[in-house]
Amino acid sequence: MQSVQSTSFCLRKQCLCLTFLLLHLLGQVAATQRCPPQCPGRCPATPPTCAPGVRAVLDGCSCCLVCARQRGESCSDLEPCDESSGLYCDRSADPSNQTGICTAVEGDNCVFDGVIYRSGEKFQPSCKFQCTCRDGQIGCVPRCQLDVLLPEPNCPAPRKVEVPGECCEKWICGPDEEDSLGGLTLAAYRPEATLGVEVSDSSVNCIEQTTEWTACSKSCGMGFSTRVTNRNRQCEMLKQTRLCMVRPCEQEPEQPTDKKGKKCLRTKKSLKAIHLQFKNCTSLHTYKPRFCGVCSDGRCCTPHNTKTIQAEFQCSPGQIVKKPVMVIGTCTCHTNCPKNNEAFLQELELKTTRGKM
């Protein structure tokens, strides 16, 4: 009898030890998924190489670029889900609320060419497009860059032609042999994509195409960026332009950050409200914009997340115009710098020196 009690006591003791060991290991794993008190001193020099259709996003700690986690994959603060695909990190199964599984936000399904897609699901109707179902709405982006990069303005009668053996078409200049562009004037129009609705409105059959905004034309001071989109009732590819300012030219490059050991200051917010200016126009309202900082180790910082607002400008007495303006959310620092990055830093330093003199 005493032997049985002794054996039972040892088993209970072993179970308690295993339980404490398991809790300790879980605590260590959870700790690796939390945001550190401060970002690591160095992120990878090059952006991560993600699978086709997967975006590179800032981790949940806003430190480094990572590949967005997809549906069914594990997620955490350091490995965020692809929110643009309607995904969120479901942490209900983790008592510590540190890790989870990327799950689609409940939404309506989509129907495309007779096929039903769930909200958050990605698909390719052809080799030219990557589409995503978002709560009953289908959004598509082109896989062919030439499909949205329009020819130069001096290109007479531009038209697209198919290339044998290739998926993507290409632009050529010159009059059409049949003297009719036909459907080529609507580069994004696809009569077969009816989504099961028989109507004459061309916008219903339009696969949305919108490029990313180009880099700002100036490294400092007010410049402009462009994109091409067919988000209009005619489904026509139109060029859009917005004002942008990555940083003011009087920013000091020799002091990129106030934190000891840091070589870059990614994002810096203006301490005082300022009027935006371009040419002879001044904004009616003041703003406290965010700017991208500079690095002391040769890297350059560029906008990562941006949005566009409509700002009112007064260009002459009584003349008020509205202009789209880029607003910076976050910036990222990397080594993929423009060729004139060194000259840009020298220009900043020269202007700063003159200002001090």
Swiss-Prot record:
The IGFBP N-terminal domain, residue ranges: 32-105
A single GO cellular-component term on record: extracellular region
InterPro entries: CCN, Cys_knot_C, Glyco_hormone_CN, Growth_fac_rcpt_cys_sf, IGFBP-like, IGFBP_CNN, Insulin_GF-bd_Cys-rich_CS, TSP1_CCN
Lipid attachment, kind S-palmitoyl cysteine: 244
Compartment(s) where it occurs, according to its Swiss-Prot or TrEMBL record: Secreted; Cytoplasm; Cell junction, Gap junction
Modified how: May be palmitoylated on Cys-244, which is important for extracellular secretion.
Top-rank taxon: Eukaryota
Keywords, comma-separated and alphabetical: Cell junction, Cytoplasm, Disulfide bond, Gap junction, Glycoprotein, Growth factor, Hormone, Lipoprotein, Palmitate, Secreted, Signal
GO BP of this protein: angiogenesis; bone regeneration; cell adhesion; cell adhesion mediated by integrin; cell chemotaxis; chondrocyte differentiation; endothelial cell chemotaxis; endothelial cell-cell adhesion
Induction: Expression is down-regulated by WT1. Expression is down-regulated by pro-inflammatory stimuli such as TNF or IL1B. Expression is induced by laminar shear stress and statins.
Tissue expression remark: Expressed in endothelial cells (at protein level). Expressed in bone marrow and thymic cells.
Disulphide-bonded residues: 35-61, 39-63, 43-64, 50-67, 75-89, 81-102, 264-301, 281-315, 292-331, 295-333, 300-337
Location of the TSP type-1 domain: 205-250
Its biological purpose: Immediate-early protein playing a role in various cellular processes including proliferation, adhesion, migration, differentiation and survival. Acts by binding to integrins or membrane receptors such as NOTCH1. Essential regulator of hematopoietic stem and progenitor cell function. Inhibits myogenic differentiation through the activation of Notch-signaling pathway. Inhibits vascular smooth muscle cells proliferation by increasing expression of cell-cycle regulators such as CDKN2B or CDKN1A independently of TGFB1 signaling.
Family, per entry: Belongs to the CCN family.
Protein name: CCN family member 3
Gene assigned in the entry: CCN3
